[in-house]
Amino acid sequence: MKRYDLRHLKDDFEPRMKEILGETHKANETLIFLFEIGDFTPIQRSADLVKECGYELYNSLKFNEVDWTIVVKK
């Protein structure tokens, strides 16, 4: 399991998330991403990106007032 905190990137987290998803990960490895949600549009964009990169979205939940967490697996 690997955790990636992308909150410091604010609304520009998608290029970094795509880069991470493009890296080689062990089979069935779980990845956890944290990012800022702002107006909630990043949630759908992140789900679309996960699917586009060939991963399965396991969980998506609000972490606190401004942060979101998603759990994905290859």
Residue ranges and their predicted role:
Residues 1-28:
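An N-terminal amphipathic alpha-helical segment
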Residues 11, 31-33, 53:
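Short non-domain terminal segments
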Residues 18-21, 39-57:
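Amphipathic alpha-helical interaction surfaces in cytosolic regulatory modules
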Residues 26, 41, 49, 60-65:
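Long, contiguous binding/interaction regions
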Residues 29-33, 46-49:
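Amphipathic, hydrophobic secondary-structure cores in small proteins
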Residues 34-38:
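Short helix-coil junctions and helix-kink-helix linkers
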Residues 54-74:
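C-terminal edge-of-domain segments
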